[in-house]
Amino acid sequence: MDREFLDPSSLSSAPLLILPGAGDQFDFGAYATHWKIDGSQTGGRFAVVHHPLMPHTLGAPLHRHHREDEYSYVLTGTFGALLGDAVVTAQTGTWVFKPRGQWHTFWNAGDAPCEIIEVISPAGFENYWRELRTVWPDRN
């Protein structure tokens, strides 16, 4: 039997079905963050966010994480990334691993919208976008 949960933020250890469009979001304009699974729901083990990117949009400036690994799955479009010294282009269905400590940036490398699902482990970094939302409230 399928179970549907309209408010996944209220769950901590129950099975979880996240409906399309569910979850909080922050819109940067040509780039957005949609929270799908929060660290509070996984005991801090991981978080999952959805990032739609408009064509030729930079997703993040060059940066690195000291505690998180990131795994990006390309749902649609062409995903470009600088991973250390390597520039990669990933098409629909491709996973891109960005290990902690590695300098990286990413962008939509195509002429059509690109969407990625990002798994962040351990959880916590998903709160960065929540912090941005508080200092940039006109983007909510």
Which residue ranges define each predicted feature?
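Extreme N-terminal tail/first-helix region
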Residues: 1-35
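Acidic/histidine-enriched, glycine/proline-rich intrinsically disordered or flexible terminal extensions
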Residues: 130-140
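A short glycine-rich, His/Asp/Glu-containing loop-to-beta-strand
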Residues: 22-62, 68-69, 124
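Residue-level recognition of well-ordered beta-strand positions that form the cores
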Residues: 52, 78-80, 119
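Glycine- and acidic-residue-biased ligand/ion/polar-headgroup-sensing regions
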Residues: 67-79, 84
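Short acidic-glycine-tyrosine-enriched beta hairpin
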Residues: 26, 85-103
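Ligand-binding loop in jelly-roll beta-barrel domains
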Residues: 44, 100-126
